């Protein structure tokens, strides 16, 4: 397993991963309409390039030179980093890939003076249990209006 910072050249791979991961992850949690909208709004190549330019660092996990997982994070306030996204192919889940990505990002955030790593996770997403196992705790429960959808999330935090 190789974990590295992604570049603009990796945007297509991240878009393809999102398409493969979002449907099985969210099909029983949110509507197909919302999945399609979110993929287009947040994971199109254009959107990912804008995120990269705005300061989001993307991380890619590769196995045998194939992208199997990705994450994105950035500084959102002094000493607080936001894990905007972390997705692992279903075939790779349970193999330590997500944990390795969290450790990689934790190290990068610490090196840059981070004290807290924060994330949002849908309250119906079983990933919240994974995040608890790697040291996150529920900080708040929120309902966020996003275009014509409501995001029912936990905000989780981990001290670095």
Where are each of the predicted segments found?
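Short coil/turn segments at alpha/beta junctions that flank glycine-rich nucleotide-binding fingerprints
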Residues: 95, 112-115
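Extreme N-terminal starter segment of soluble prokaryotic enzymes
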Residues: 1-3
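Active-site acidic-Proline motif in GNAT/NAT acetyltransferases
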Residues: 89-95, 123
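Residues forming the Rossmann-fold NAD(P)(H) cofactor-binding site
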Residues: 99
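Acetyl-CoA-dependent GNAT
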Residues: 5-11, 15-91, 102-104, 108, ...
């Amino acid at each position: 397993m190789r974990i590295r910072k992604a570049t603009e050249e990796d945007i297509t791979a991240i878009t393809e991963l999102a398409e493969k991961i979002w449907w099985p992850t969210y099909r029983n949690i949110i509507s197909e309409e919302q999945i399609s909208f979110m993929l287009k709004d947040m994971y199109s190549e254009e959107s990912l390039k804008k995120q990269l330019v705005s300061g989001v660092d993307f991380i890619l996990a590769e196995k045998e030179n194939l992208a199997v997982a990705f994450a994105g994070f950035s500084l959102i306030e002094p000493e607080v980093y936001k894990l905007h996204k972390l997705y692992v192919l279903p075939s790779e889940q349970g193999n330590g890939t997500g944990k390795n990505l969290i450790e990689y990002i934790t190290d990068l955030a610490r090196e840059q003076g981070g004290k807290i790593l924060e994330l949002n996770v849908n309250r119906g997403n079983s990933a919240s249990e994974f995040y608890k196992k790697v040291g996150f705790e529920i900080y708040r429960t929120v309902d966020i209006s996003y275009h014509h959808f409501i995001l029912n999330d936990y905000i989780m935090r981990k001290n670095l």
